[in-house]
A protein has these predicted regions:
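Glycosyltransferase-associated regions of secretory-pathway enzymes
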Residues: 11-196
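A conserved donor-nucleotide-binding helix/loop in the catalytic core
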Residues: 1-9
Length: 196
């Protein structure tokens, strides 16, 4: 992304339509970064907690350059806890953590929060993840069972978000269900994972 620009979508995402909407949005609001933020992790709306499973940026995006620099120079050679300790030593951990759960695992989120607070001035085009990729999660109050019922055993009615993000617990046993044909025709799983 730093050198060539483009779109990064984590493999644990389900695309329900082409990514043309990203280009349309970019033309409308020329930002140096497009992505999603998670409101439930955000305490300070001026610094939304940006997710890293979807990123779109033009070549040379200052945000991507700064984020990569922070990650490669301060995070990657440390464990998650060591990076937390590093931020505590700087006196910024509680500020950048906001409501991020599992900060030792989500060190890339912390690194982005650190550069947003310490450098700033970036042009971001962010959408609330709870309204799109996590909409099905929100409808099921973030429970795995309600999400799997929506993915596997409910026919798609109406519009889906262009992207559905599956977290690690959401993916657990999903292949088991698909391999055994445990889904209904017309469901998200049937349309976008099996290709019926």
């Amino acid at each position: 992304l730093r050198r060539y620009g483009g779109i990064w979508v984590d493999a644990s995402s389900i695309l329900t339509r082409s990514l043309d909407w990203v280009l349309t949005q970019y033309i409308r609001t020329p930002a140096e970064f497009m992505g999603f933020y998670l409101e439930r992790h955000t305490r300070d709306a001026a610094y939304p907690v940006v997710e890293n499973w979807f990123m779109a940026a033009p070549p040379g995006s200052r945000l991507i350059v700064d984020w990569q620099h922070e990650f490669t120079t301060e995070v990657i050679h440390r464990s998650g806890q060591e990076y937390i300790d590093h931020l505590k030593d700087k006196g910024v951990f509680e500020t950048v953590r906001q409501h991020i759960d599992s900060p030792d695992y989500l060190s890339m989120h912390l690194a982005l929060q650190y550069i947003l607070h310490s450098r700033g001035g970036y042009r971001l085009a962010l959408a609330r993840a709870e309204d799109g990729p996590f909409r099905l999660h929100v409808l099921g109050r973030w429970g795995r069972t309600p999400l799997k019922l929506r993915l596997l055993f409910s026919r798609v009615i109406g519009d889906l978000p262009p992207l559905i993000k599956l977290r690690a617990p959401d993916r657990k046993r999903l292949d088991h269900y698909l391999d055994r044909g445990l889904y209904v025709r017309g469901s998200v799983a049937a349309r976008y994972l099996v290709g019926e």
